[in-house]
Each structure stands twice: as C-alpha cells, then as structure tokens.
Amino acid sequence: SVGFKAGVKEYKLTYYTPXXXAKDTDILAAFXVTPQPGVPPEEAGXXVAAESSTGTWTTVWTDGLTSLDRXKGXCYHIEPVIGEKDQYICYVAYPLDLFEEGSVTNMFTSIVGNVFGFKALRALRLEDLRIPVAYVKTFQGPPHGIQVERDKLNKYGRPLLGCTIKPKLGLSAKNYGRAVYECLRGGLDFTKDDENVNSQPFMRWRDRFLFCAEALYKAQAETGEIKGHYLNATAGTCEEMIKRAVFARELGVPIVMHDYLTGGFTANTSLAHYCRDNGLLLHIHRAMHAVIDRQKNHGMHFRVLRKALRLSGGDHIHSGTVVGKLEGEREITLGFVDLLRDDFIEKDRSRGIYFTQDWVSLPGVIPVASGGIHVWHMPALTEIFGDDSVLQFGGGTLGHPWGNAPGAVANRVALEACVQARNEGRDLAREGNAIIREASKWSPELAAACEVWKEIKFEFAAMDTLD
C-alpha cells in the first residue's frame, strides 16, 4: 500500500514518545491533564501535544508533503499528580520552528490556542513553560529593567512605595491630581491609575495626564525626590494607546502603565518597544488574570503569564502579596517573583517551578505587592519581597484617618523603620510588630495608622496550594 492511510488513528501512536529526550532549543510545557473517564493518560498527553502543534483529528493527505517528525510537538513524559485521582502532569516538547520569533501572541496561540476545548479532556491547565535561550533572544523584554529603573529614580537599598488612587472611578481630573500630589508629597515614590481608569466621560485621559504631571512636578520640587505616577495608557486601539504614551513622554513623566491581558500581548509588546525607545518605564497591571489562572485544574498558572510578560515587556508587574486580600501562597509567589527578577532560576517543584529557566540577558521585572495591605504588613512585605519590589498601599494610604498625605507619611516611616531594622540585623519576621510600635512613638501619623488597622486580617485559605 502507499504511505497514506486514511482514517482516524490514536494520537499516542505518533505523539507519545517516552524514549525521546527534549532538545535545548525546544519550548517545553508542563500541563496538568484531567482526561475524561476511560481515556488513558498516554492518549490524553499525546492529544495535547498533537492539537497544540501539527495534529488534527484525522490523517490528512497533506501530511505527506512535510516532515511531521521535524515539526510535531511530542509528549515525552507523564507523571501522576500526587494526591489527585485521574490527574497527570504531561510534559510536551515543541520544536522551535513552530513559533514566530519575538511573538508572545503566536506562542500562546500555538500552545494554548485550541487544545483547551478538546473533548477527550475533562480539564487542562498549563502549569509552566521553559522558554529556550534561542527563543528568549528574539524578544526585547522589559523596556529598562530593575537597575536602570533605580538609576532613573535615584532610589537604592529599599523597596519602592506606591498607592493606587481611590475611588477608582468618579473623581474629576483636578481632584484626582490633588490626591496624587498629597500622596507623593507625603513620601511615596509612585501613585497609580487604577486599571479601569482609561478615558471615561467623567475624566478624559488628557486632563488626567496634565493634572497628574502638575502634581508630580510640585511634589518633586517640594521633596527633592524623583516621583512617578503610572499613567494608564491602555486604550481601545493600539494607535490610541501609543498616542497616550507619546503625550506622557511630552509631559516628561517617568512612567506609563498598561493592562497587558485585557490590552493583549501584541499591544503590550508595541508599547514596551515604544517605552524603551523613549525612556519611559512601563508598569503592568494583570487585570483579568484570575479568569485564566484561578481554577486549580483548568486554565494557565500565573507563572506562565509572568514569563510571557517578561518576554513581551514590562518593568513592574503585580504579584499578589502573600499577606493581603488577594491570593498568593508564599512559596509559589516567591517562586514566580524569582522568575521575574533573576537571570537563572533552577527547577524547584516545591516552589512550583517545573523547569530550569535561563533568561540570559533579558532585564528583570520588579514585582508589585498590592491589595489589602497596610502598615502592620510592612515588616512581612520587606522580608518576603526584599529591596527590588514595589509595595502598593491604596486603601492603606488613602484610608488614613487624617487624610492622604499623613497616610503616605505613615507608610514611608514604617518602611524606613523596617529597612533600618533589617540592616541592623534584626529579624523582621519575629520582631515586626515591635519595630512598627517603636517607630510609631516618634511618628504621630504612623501611630494613628496603627490604631485604625490593628485588627484587620483577610483570613481565607489560599486557592493556589502546592500538591
């Protein structure tokens, strides 16, 4: 018979290759696969490899016109998930030829574009990706990175402080600018547009940019420190987004902001390129991430979105807090914080890292801890996130009983006290509360903040636990 045999054949015959070893240039993926009852794991794993690379549901004549073995994804290892019935980690290797250079959009379209609706699987979650050096080098990555940001801001040896301006919707541009000024004047490094502040009827973007720039320069003149406000450039079209970034550059502000998941990777990469060319820092908000990453058995883990952002480009990204109101289990959070900041990260399953990742010369991204945190959390945050981080207190600044500026003062005093205590060799984890109490003796603003928030805790079990 001729080589071509029509009909449906099992995926595992072609796409399950337990003997093969992955190449250094392959993109590797770890999927948590939950097959439908009766579907063997080898078939499910091979189905994922096939549907996310060269396969389709039946043998096609045109397969003969190419070398499938050269271009197909292959499932090279399967292991059961400990403690879960009928769940497996399937490791898939994709040849580099399958992907367009420098395109996160294409990488995701290939790897997660189609296969998640596949009928033979009850659920599917992409847990981790290993991006090979050969592919990493096709991306610009973050516009500036951690060291360049510190040099631009002239701030060293401590975490940076931020604050999201609230109420997030409804303020006029002038009142918004006033809140920005008060926070920066009180001692914060950054203030932030909320992710859904774009250009609404009650406050158009240009007015907001102007009033925020004015607030920034006034606070800079009075404090002698460089200040920033994350001007949200996210818009309905790429052209409009770039127009807003251009205006921010003309105002001479240091940083703009983008919602990278709702805005999309193509828009984000364009903005990152613009930011590097024009000396703007880029703050990234992860709005919509929980739609993708919150379910334990389906979707995509945040560490994958994290790696994608480092390729696409951003200087800051929100990372959960470990201690506030939004999720983040400590070891897992620290695992992906390292993936953001370090050049080389070893495989470590206890922190959810499935592959060793080498970022070579791609700049790092600063993790932003934000959501339900206040002065009492400061020692823990300083201890967990270290110096290369932004600690963002929205309500924890603006909720101060005396107003915004005293709220900012309280946070800055608490931070400086924690950094000093750490540098003196004290144990922040154990002595944290004592350090804050001591500092509040000579800062009435901090004392008032300690009064208001002494009892608040958001105690729920984290959804994202290690198996």
From Swiss-Prot:
CDD domains: RuBisCO_large_I. Substrate binds at residues 114, 164, 168, 286, 318, 370. PROSITE patterns: RUBISCO_LARGE. The keyword RNA-binding does not apply. Mg(2+) binds at residues 192, 194-195. It catalyses: 2 (2R)-3-phosphoglycerate + 2 H(+) = D-ribulose 1,5-bisphosphate + CO2 + H2O; D-ribulose 1,5-bisphosphate + O2 = 2-phosphoglycolate + (2R)-3-phosphoglycerate + 2 H(+). The modification N6-carboxylysine is found at residue 192. Its cofactor is Mg(2+). InterPro entries: RuBisCO, RuBisCo_large_chain_AS, RuBisCO_lsu_C, RuBisCO_lsu_C_sf, RuBisCO_lsu_fd_N, RuBisCO_lsu_N_sf, RuBisCO_lsuI. The disulfide bond which can form in the large chain dimeric partners within the hexadecamer appears to be associated with oxidative stress and protein turnover. Belongs to the RuBisCO large chain family. Type I subfamily. RuBisCO catalyzes two reactions: the carboxylation of D-ribulose 1,5-bisphosphate, the primary event in carbon dioxide fixation, as well as the oxidative fragmentation of the pentose substrate in the photorespiration process. Both reactions occur simultaneously and in competition at the same active site. Heterohexadecamer of 8 large chains and 8 small chains; disulfide-linked. The disulfide link is formed within the large subunit homodimers. The basic functional RuBisCO is composed of a large chain homodimer in a 'head-to-tail' conformation. In form I RuBisCO this homodimer is arranged in a barrel-like tetramer with the small subunits forming a tetrameric 'cap' on each end of the 'barrel'. This is Ribulose bisphosphate carboxylase large chain. The lineage of its organism: Eukaryota, Viridiplantae, Streptophyta, Embryophyta, Tracheophyta.
